[in-house]
């Protein structure tokens, strides 16, 4: 029955349904209506324009960008995802990351290159806005960020100090091992003095902190709604995204547990990690951590723009400054000698000459962290006032997917960037870093082709002695999954496609412009030979292992599928500085999952294939045929097929996304977060912070979130039914439009438009499959995809689907829907079968009162949308 409130909206559709003859299902183009809108599927340039319009130009309207910005001349701050319930690296979708900021720089660089070359409409200038937006995550350049109750923090005070010191502390495997033990050995950054000399007039380091709460959801900014720097992961390799304790980067001792300290009333949240047993153990301070793959992506963006004829002006200098200071990421955590194998080993001296430094590994490690005092408790007895101490640490662990030899190449050899790095020894360091990074990939490439994990100078996080079986790379030992073990950090296929894209783009520049190293050898190979060796094996493996019209073990059908997760066995041989094609025959990976993959993963794979093809002068015609025998030509064809299929099946009203399901989300409701015994405090929003709390307990703000409430209702229903943990989220589906996914899709469509403007997407006339599809997310979950609203199974969602539903409701014998159509059409209160509400909701999409991405929805949300 149709309610009175629904009659007005349904009248037209109902009349059509009652007067229509039987609906005859028709075949449609493989592209859905969003994919073809404005002719977007006719060329990759149009594809880029269509997606850029949704994500950047109208990003605020479509939910990608916040109203908060970094002042005039910037875009809105990009969220990690449009949607809110998103627990992976960020623990809330409307946080942002340095990753997202680097994509903002990268996609705006692509926009300006394409506009400058008249391949798309519009003008240049977006790159400058993109970089200004990125600077919101650089503390001293963040125009509107929360800066404490006083409204400002002097980050330049860092340079007033002669040295920065850290206390050597063990890394414990489990969160329960924290607060960890200090051993009394002081650690000093030996190149701090060089940065002070070069950049002492700046407002601190020109590095991005990795995470921020875009609109102060956690309220560490006092509930102001301001952009607020926060941090999470702090407690060992087993601390998953469900086990972190969020904390503000500006620790004002306003939250946490009440204490009888004579100077402060609260411990601060950092006390959970660092302890609170003695007065002054946690002082008012700021602290930040970078993730250098993001800085390197931003540097890559500027180099890309420059290599394609854009005058980047001051941005080249800023990118160089950022790269110069990323040398902080080339050092052991506590500046101990590489290969020391003892936590009691002394660190390099703060005054060490560059030639005497022993702690520099030259790779891009997982982070550098720094911070300092804002108002010490003993300031009343301190004539120098505030800001009288600071700390810094490097990182002992290096992962293959954090390396960016393309950025290192630019910083070492580009005439503009190399000259713009002001600190001493920067160019020499990057020449050595570039060499080490290429060798790193040669060392880690498996027999199959994908790259194994990485290495560490601190085995077990405690500088343990190496075993005789540990393979070594410049006196650091091999680690299968560096940094994180829940889940292991090198299972996800994204680690492969991100890193290899950089190698392929570098290969393209070397082939087209020559080798700027002027004959440097890498494991005995020239640069071109080394890159070709790495790429040929890797690309060959992906071509062999990519599937079309794939059906998984559960019967889920996919238009295409790439490997989604890898398990590893064996180890590489110890690196002896000479490459051997057979040295790693015992190092292999096994595909443990196939999927349509993250949008970003498929896109980045295609980007790699396009650059490899262009480097090898493959003609555009190869993209239009399967009759290729050359590997590079086969790669270009595969890129065209994957990009076309992804666009045609996953394009929706605001971007590209598939329906998702993450079985591990039950941990949101059940996972205990370790809080040390004796601690009994509160988060800024009043959430309890004491032993026994769960992820949800310390994030009570989630209780107001509609996505969270939907997930919780399904969890509780399944829990009451006695389902096992693996099945507690059965029936829970959603879409996530991640900003980095859109970023990689934009870069890849743009790259095809730039390098192969004559290649056309594949748009065969064939039935659109709306069957369920398994995909993998960054958490390694499995998902199902249905074309919500497509009741007549014609591959698009229109008023005709509402008509089909109403006809079936009125006379199911005469107007029977297909089984898949019934599933597709059940968009309101999913699970109760098709009703008039479903028809109403579909018509509301046509009337722009709902978005297709809102499906499935509830009766309550339907009523609210009608106003």
Specify the residue positions occupied by each region the protein language model found.
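Bacterial N-terminal signal peptides that target proteins for export
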Residues: 2-13
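Cellulosome-associated attachment modules in secreted, modular CAZymes
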Residues: 9, 24-28, 768-867
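Hydrophobic core
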Residues: 14-22
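N-terminal module-boundary/linker segments of secreted carbohydrate-active enzymes
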Residues: 28-132, 309, 313-321, 376, ...
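Extended ligand-binding clefts on enzyme/binding-domain cores
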Residues: 57-69, 136-280, 289-293, 317-723, ...
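Long, well-ordered hydrophobic secondary-structure segments characteristic of membrane-embedded
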Residues: 99-109, 122-135, 276-280, 284-303
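Short glycine/serine- and small hydrophobic-enriched flexible loop segments
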Residues: 106-116, 300-308, 409-413, 501-512, ...
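Long C-terminal extensions of eukaryotic subunits of large macromolecular complexes
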Residues: 715-767
